[in-house]
């Protein structure tokens, strides 16, 4: 079921990407299976980061974030990468160098603004 969700998300993002190519996307595969992906819109808005639960805590998310930072560093109009994190992922983003950039918003699962400055 989770792989189906990943496949459907990647397919819908691919359609979006074909029409809006100002950004970055990358997939992380192991033995031909996509186990994670990242999407950054307009070279500054990290909109999607996902790693399958069985592959979390092996550095895949960190590698995907670093690839996005490297790709967007020179093209980001704000020289920053921004995102809104759930409370679940907040510690991860702090560990990879993001700083909270505003107050948390009351949303299901949390909504904490973060940014990474280049």
Question: Could you describe each region identified by the protein language model?
Answer:
Residues 1-14:
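Conserved GNAT-fold acetyl-CoA-binding loop/helix
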Residues 57-70:
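Conserved acetyl-CoA-binding loop-helix of GNAT-fold acetyltransferases
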